[in-house]
UniProtKB/Swiss-Prot annotation:
Presence of the UniProt keyword Secreted in the record: yes
Subcellular locations according to the entry: Secreted, Cell wall
Phylogenetic classification of the source organism: Eukaryota, Viridiplantae, Streptophyta, Embryophyta, Tracheophyta
Organism (species): Daucus carota (Wild carrot)
Record's GO cellular component terms: extracellular region
Principal location: secreted
Keyword Secreted: yes
Name of the protein described by the UniProt record: 56 kDa cell wall protein
Domain of life: Eukaryota
Keywords: Cell wall, Secreted
Amino acid sequence: SQEDTPL
């Protein structure tokens, strides 16, 4: 998810 990825 967006919370899991730094990009």
